[in-house]
Amino acid sequence: MGANQLVVLNVYDMYWMNEYTSSIGIGVFHSGIEVYGREFAYGGHPYPFSGIFEISPGNASELGETFKFKEAVVLGSTDFLEDDIEKIVEELGKEYKGNAYHLMHKNCNHFSSALSEILCGKEIPRWINRLAYFSSCIPFLQSCLPKEWLTPAALQSSVSQELQDELEEAEDAAASASVASTAAGSRPGRHTKL
């Protein structure tokens, strides 16, 4: 294995909402795991591919205007190499698909905790995901939350790129099929007399 790399939880305050929720003891936070100078996070979108995305560590502006960097929490260290971490994130992407996002059961903080457990054997602090706990007690709470909370700006551009790539692949495949059928049609064929 490689060098001992710090595993850091970057926590973001959804500050305009926290003006209201902090008075009742519930913060609304987004989180991501930083390792090897890269930050991995998870968000929802309506498609059946990975909702995991990458941003510059601690850069709240990449998440959107409703986010503000709150703090970095050192969770531990890992001996995984950077290539190993990419494979781990890719595997987690099969479970953390965009259309599987759920505020109570599978949100960004659940992802951060899962990745942290794999990398350094520790869950994230409980206070970061307190909203999920309370919303499981008050089911209608999720329907009251703005849709943009589910899909941070950084993920929206990642999803747009993924969809653009899929469209280009489909167009390339269609063009190849068209060229192949045209070429096949211009080949001399067998002619038989009846």
UniProtKB/Swiss-Prot annotation:
Enzyme class, first EC level, given as a word: hydrolase
GO biological process, one term: proteolysis
PROSITE patterns the UniProt entry points to: PPPDE
UniProt-listed Pfam families: Peptidase_C97
Entry GO MF terms: cysteine-type deubiquitinase activity; deubiquitinase activity; K48-linked deubiquitinase activity; K63-linked deubiquitinase activity; long-chain fatty acyl-CoA hydrolase activity; palmitoyl-(protein) hydrolase activity
Residue numbers annotated as active site: 30, 108
Residue intervals of the PPPDE domain: 5-149
Reaction(s) the record says it catalyses: Thiol-dependent hydrolysis of ester, thioester, amide, peptide and isopeptide bonds formed by the C-terminal Gly of ubiquitin (a 76-residue protein attached to proteins as an intracellular targeting signal); S-hexadecanoyl-L-cysteinyl-[protein] + H2O = L-cysteinyl-[protein] + hexadecanoate + H(+)
Its EC number(s): 3.4.19.12, 3.1.2.22
Ranges where the record places region Disordered: 165-194
Key words, A-Z: Cytoplasm, Hydrolase, Protease, Ubl conjugation pathway
Regulation of activity: Palmostatin B inhibits its palmitoyl protein thioesterase activity.
GO cellular component: cytoplasm
Keyword Cytoplasm: yes
Localization (cell): Cytoplasm
Domain of life: Eukaryota
Biased composition, class Low complexity, residue ranges: 173-186
UniProt keyword annotation of Hydrolase present: yes
Known role: Has deubiquitinating activity towards 'Lys-48'- and 'Lys-63'-linked polyubiquitin chains. Deubiquitinates 'Lys-48'-linked polyubiquitination of RPS7 leading to its stabilization. Exhibits palmitoyl protein thioesterase (S-depalmitoylation) activity towards synthetic substrates 4-methylumbelliferyl-6-S-palmitoyl-beta-D-glucopyranoside and S-depalmitoylation probe 5 (DPP-5).
Similarity comment text for this entry: Belongs to the DeSI family.
Subunit organization: Interacts with RPS7.
Protein name: Deubiquitinase DESI2
